[in-house]
């Protein structure tokens, strides 16, 4: 990394509704000289000795209502206050600062989980767009990396843009049931 790069964002836009501008499949990597506000706030709460993200994963595992899938090394959860219908986070169970810190077994486990979850995302509706964001920590800061999958169902309007508050029409519990393959009542 260059010395002026403070934050690196890895992402993929799939489909026109998700901002895809080039038709072939590709990932993008951007290095920023600043730390985005959301990443900075998250980093403040993810210190290894007192990681809010670790606590959230422990809570979700105990409650089981918002667990979409679980593997040996990862949890897939539908976040309590998601911004998008069927939003999904894939996170290592153990505290890991960087996406690059995985060993071979963890990489294989993540690849299988990501594939499984993307099959379900793309089955939500015909030609659904989605974004995949690898959320790594700011340079030289502790963090709990994770992947966010953001299906682009519905859209933002004036309220969301004006307030940075999101109205999500699908509860995270309902989304988790969908990802687990449970029939709706």
Q: What function would you assign to each model-found segment?
A:
Residues 1-185:
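HIT superfamily nucleotide-processing domains
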